[in-house]
Structure formats: structure tokens, C-alpha cells
A protein has these predicted regions:
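Canonical Rossmann dinucleotide-binding motif of NAD(H)/NADP(H)-dependent dehydrogenases/reductases
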Residues: 4-37
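Short, small/polar-rich loop/turn modules that mediate ligand/substrate recognition or access, typified
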Residues: 183, 188, 258-260
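Alpha-helical segment proximal to the catalytic Tyr-Lys
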Residues: 136, 180-181, 256
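Short C-terminal tail/terminal secondary-structure segment
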Residues: 2-6, 156, 236, 246-248, ...
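Residue(s) in the substrate-gating loop at a strand-loop-helix junction
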Residues: 151
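Active-site helix of classical SDR
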Residues: 131, 167, 175
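Substrate-binding pocket helix/loop in short-chain dehydrogenase/reductase
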Residues: 98-117, 228
């Protein structure tokens, strides 16, 4: 039976697909009949539930910051599935830090050139390289969808995460600008900006320690904030599947006239 989204036979490329949002998105594509190319730096292929899935999976270790790695991935994907239809630009990193740390100038949690270069390389350069490589395929084929994963931080800014927020704002600008360039070729470009979620691949202990330091709170208080009951009108954190549901809809032909916009998935917390 064909699903309402009708993704049977489509091929989606998902970066950062070994964990968190990316893995949930990849699994959802598989469950809805799409073939999926999962790209990630993790040398160990993650486990997916393929038993009930109608789509096929290809895992390719990919460094999205290196053009040659991206090109090699595209060639492997085409060899496996032929036509490529969807790109989910999900790969990203977040290293919390302060612009100025009066308690420890130029210390561990103050923004450095190394951190700046690392975060912008993945979150901006990686998005551009993937979009350009798949964009060539989509323009040549006369159709395609690019979905750029942003964040509520990119819309509102975020204490202790200024460089991450800046990169996500750049991604929002990519979405708007590329939509003006690629629409004439029947290539849609849209964005998704999640708010606080129950769990993501970014939330390690080191991340929590860094973010709690930049905000002057304990890790325990930070974790209480994940529940998000007071700051979000819906009174809870989001689920990874709720993000994936929107991604799948935007990737489908049901969203064929949606182009050049970034959608919030933040329980009403973020607007704009």
C-alpha cells in the first residue's frame, strides 16, 4: 500500500545520520519506502530497523567539510540507487563557549579560533558543499529537494552558543538565497528549525558541562530545563519523531509549493 507521503522509490541523502535527529529522519524515510544514503563520520555503521522497512540503506563514511569526500559519496550513492531526489543537510556540531570569559580569559570555555573554525567548517562549509554537490544532480534531473536543518538558536540567538547560533542563522540565509537560485530548475529548498528536544546526538556530558558553565548554572539545572515546561506553550520538549515527520512531509510531493522558508518545530516557543 502506497503511503500518503508517496516516497516509494525516492532516494534521500541524510548527513549526520548515525545518531539523533539524523538517524530518526533516516529511519522514517526507510519506513516510508524511500532509499536512504546515510552519511556520517562514524566509522561504525549504525543499526537501523530494516525488517519492516520498504526502502534500502547505504551507509557511507563522509566528511562533509571535504569536497573530495562529498564527491565520492555522491558517486557511491548514484551507483547504488541511480537518481538522487532529496538532501537532508543535518550534520552539525555545537561547542558551547563565551565570547568573553572574565573568570578565565582565553580559557577552556572562551571562543577560540580553533572552535570558530571547527564549528563553521561543519555547519556552514559542510552545508554548502553538500548542497552544491546534490544541487548539480537535482538541476540535471530537473527536480529535487534540499532540506537544511537549522535551530531555534539561529532565529533567536543563544547564550553560550553564539557561534552555533550564527552558523544556523547562516543556514537560514542559505535556504532563502538558494531558493531564489534553484526554484527555476524545479529544485525546492526549505529549512527546519527544532527547539529543545528530548534527546539529540549533540547532548554529551562534555557539552552539558560546557553549556552549564557558560550560563552559570549546574548540569542538574540545565537538565531540568530540557523538560521545557515553562518556556514552551505546549509545556514539554519535542520528540525526534516530530522533527522527522515535518522533514518527510517537506520532502514529499505533498509540499510541492513550499519553498524558501524555515519552519520552527519548537512547541510555540520560537516565532519568526
Amino acid at each position: 500500500m502506497t503511503s500518503w507521503l508517496n516516497l516509494e522509490g525516492k532516494t534521500a541523502v541524510v548527513t549526520g545520520g548515525a545518531s539523533g535527529i539524523g538517524k530518526t529522519v533516516a529511519q522514517s524515510f526507510l519506513d516510508n519506502g524511500a532509499n536512504v544514503v546515510v552519511c556520517d563520520m562514524n566509522p561504525d555503521e549504525p543499526e537501523f530497523e530494516l525488517g519492516g522497512s520498504r526502502g534500502k540503506l547505504l551507509y557511507v563514511v563522509t566528511d562533509v567539510t571535504k569536497a573530495e569526500s562529498v564527491t565520492a559519496m555522491v558517486e557511491k550513492a548514484k551507483a547504488a540507487f541511480g537518481k538522487l531526489d532529496i538532501l537532508v543537510n543535518n550534520a552539525g556540531i555545537n561547542i558551547p563557549c563565551l565570547l568573553v570569559d572574565p573568570k578565565d580569559p582565553h580559557g577552556k570555555y572562551e571562543l577560540s579560533e580553533r572552535v570558530y573554525d571547527k564549528v563553521t567548517s561543519v555547519n556552514i562549509k559542510g552545508v554548502y558543499l553538500m548542497a552544491q554537490a546534490l544541487g548539480h544532480e537535482f538541476v540535471r534531473n530537473g527536480s529535487g529537494v534540499i532540506i537544511n536543518m537549522s535551530s531555534e538558536s539561529g532565529l533567536e540567538g543563544s547564550e553560550g552558543q553564539s557561534i552555533y547560533a550564527a552558523t544556523k542563522n547562516a543556514v537560514n540565509s542559505f535556504t532563502r538565497s538558494w531558493s531564489k537560485e534553484l526554484g527555476r530548475y524545479n529544485v525546492r529548498v526549505v529549512g527546519v528549525a527544532p527547539g529543545i528536544l528530548e534527546a539529540t546526538g549533540l547532548r554529551t556530558l562534555a557539552y552539558e558541562e560546557a553549556l552549564s558553565y557558560t550560563r552559570g548554572i549546574t548540569v542538574e539545572d540545565l537538565r531540568k530545563g530540557y523538560k521545557n515546561t515553562k518556556t514552551t506553550p505546549l509545556g514539554r520538549s519535542g520528540k525526534l519523531t516530530e522533527v522527522a515527520n515535518l522533514v518527510l512531509f517537506l520532502a514529499s510531493d505533498r509540499a510541492s509549493y513550499i519553498h524558501g522558508v524555515t519552519y520552527n518545530v519548537a512547541g510555540g516557543k520560537t516565532r519568526g
